[in-house]
């Protein structure tokens, strides 16, 4: 069963994403901070990571993505954030600022979330 790691400091978001993804048959782990997220990636070995951008610091999600890529982690990363594309940053595996595979704005419809997850996990 593919495992998804959610890193978001909003417990309501975490709970709703867990509910949606668990119902689709995914194993789901969660972390609520940048530090917890980094530890969870090492411990849980997820097949997909969903990150919020703004947690304790305004750029926490981007820092997690940057740190993971610098460590050689190839796991697909989806940024799920209320700031959308307003930052003007280019995202993608080759981006230094936002080395993620997908950037999705909150709120997201459950069916759209599942479609994004399936895109990367081919389930």
List PLM regions with ranges.
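Active-site beta3 strand of CheY-like receiver
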Residues: 44-50
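The short loop immediately C-terminal to the conserved phospho-acceptor aspartate in CheY-like receiver
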Residues: 10, 54-56
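Two-component/phosphorelay signaling modules centered on CheY-like receiver
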Residues: 11-29
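Hydrophobic/aromatic residues positioned on beta-strands within the core alpha/beta folds
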Residues: 80-82
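Conserved sequence signature across two-component system core domains
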Residues: 7-8, 31, 49
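Conserved phosphotransfer cores of two-component systems
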Residues: 42-44, 68-74
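Helix N-cap/capping motif at the beta->alpha junctions
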Residues: 30-39, 60-61
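Alpha4 helix (beta4-alpha4-beta5 surface) of REC/receiver domains from two-component response regulators
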Residues: 62-63, 70, 84-104, 111, ...
């Amino acid at each position: 069963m593919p495992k998804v790691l959610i890193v978001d400091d909003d417990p309501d978001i975490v709970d709703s994403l867990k509910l949606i993804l668990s119902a689709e048959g995914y194993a789901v782990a969660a972390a609520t901070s940048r530090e917890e997220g980094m530890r969870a990636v090492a411990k849980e070995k997820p097949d997909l990571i969903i990150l919020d951008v703004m947690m304790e610091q305004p750029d926490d999600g981007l820092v997690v993505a940057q740190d993971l890529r610098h460590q050689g982690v190839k796991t697909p990363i989806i940024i799920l954030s209320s700031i959308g594309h307003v930052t003007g940053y280019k995202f993608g595996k080759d981006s230094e600022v936002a080395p993620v595979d997908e950037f999705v704005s909150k709120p997201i419809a459950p069916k759209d979330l599942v479609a994004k997850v399936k895109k990367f996990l081919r389930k």
